[in-house]
Amino acid sequence: MSPSIAAKDSTADLVAADVVATTSSIAARLAATAGENDAKRSFPRENIKLLGEKGLMGMLLPEKLGGLNASALAFARSVQIIGGSCASTGMVFVMHCCAVETIFRHQPGQEKLLKQAAAGEHLSTLACSERGSGANFYASASTSRQTACGIELNGAKSFVTSGALADSYVVSLRALGSESSINTTLYVLEKDTPGMEFSGQWDGLGLRGNSSIVMNLKDCPVAEPGTSQVGAQGQGFEIEMSTILPRFLLGTAAVYNGIAEAAMSASIEHVKSRELTHTGEKLNAMPVMRNK
């Protein structure tokens, strides 16, 4: 390995270690409200604010935009910590990272939004899944049409994390004039876009605080496609496969891994501390437990 490559790898390792250490340092604070967030379906605003204060909301963005330019490994390890501390916060964070990375890579001219996102001043998310498409989140029945005033969007999106609470949404719809569910175009819609409404509530175990709800679009106007459209017409599927899917899979896997680790830790602590009153023995002293 050449000295220059070795130096680059060493720098990347230091950045990754710093990102993970920063995330670990606030894990207890993230976990403090996790139970209440889930029980009351409370959106983890304070946790998202804390991540922003620590400079983590731009984890994947380049340094020139205020980001950390973190590696995939640092992202996964950090998300695992966040998800294990508060599952709802973990999912909100992952969807935000996926959305802002998509905007960064495929929508020029959004430096202001991206800098705000990195600073924790702008929360973004994805709105791609639909009730009828199952795991095929890239397949869209939602439509777009050209009008005299611009482009209008119609359809419904399911499982929109941070629904009604994010500042912007990366939305997928069929390309203009297309009848194909995978010939799609992506748009960034601001939270106050006319014709965009939200409904329902999410009842996912441990994830009730992430506001993963339904987005309804009714004649939703895109007056300036040049500033709202992500990539070219019909490029949605390509962007979803190349940019969104890898980060979505890595991020959600890390969240659920963190949840599993937290559940295991809680279970171990329970058998170590639970005492049987009639014998005075702890659960972990029982043969059936020790043999597991």
Question: Where is each model-derived feature located?
Answer:
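Glycine-rich beta->alpha junctions and the first turn(s) of the following alpha-helix
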Residues: 204-292
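Conserved hydrophobic/aromatic beta-strand scaffold that supports enzyme active sites
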Residues: 141-143, 168-172, 186-188, 214-219
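Glycine-rich flavin
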Residues: 43-53, 58-161
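Buried hydrophobic positions in well-ordered alpha/beta secondary-structure cores of metabolic enzymes
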Residues: 78, 153-155, 187, 217, ...
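Alpha-helical interface subdomain recognition
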Residues: 2-77, 253-292
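Short loop segments at secondary-structure junctions
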Residues: 106-108, 147-149, 174-178, 191-194, ...
